[in-house]
């Protein structure tokens, strides 16, 4: 967090494009700051529904699902798969089986299919945990994200997020903390 904030202090123009800081705030429990970071990122990239999902998740922690859904960012342009479908999921318009059916029906090339599934498993897992309270199902999807070939072999920032979120959900499940 401090390194990201220092980057922005040294180069203020970086603030609007700094989605990583928003995710950092989210995992530190600074949900208002996280939501704000995702709001200003939208000025930088008005297509990226992944950003809108993080804003939604931050707002859920502050004010609940109903209010967060009422405040979802409106997108006008298309986005990369699976984000339009994931956004529909977070809006409450589809369920995970429909999302996965759409991915499989798209018949993407193998490597791209793996990439799309990684993102779907990650966000469906978080959705099931956060919105539906289905911890066991969430854990299974997060495990699939972590073991996904694309995620494992690229080691991207989002794969690290998946790994950390999966570890957190496992920890809570083991010691049976209320969620």
Task: State each model region's role.
Residues 27, 61, 130-131, 165-168, ...:
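Register position in tetratricopeptide repeats
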Residues 2, 29, 63, 132-133:
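Residue-level detector of the short coil/turn that links helix A to helix B
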Residues 10, 44-45, 78, 113, ...:
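Structural marker of alpha-solenoid helical repeat scaffolds
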Residues 6-7, 40-41, 75, 145:
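Canonical positions in the second alpha-helix
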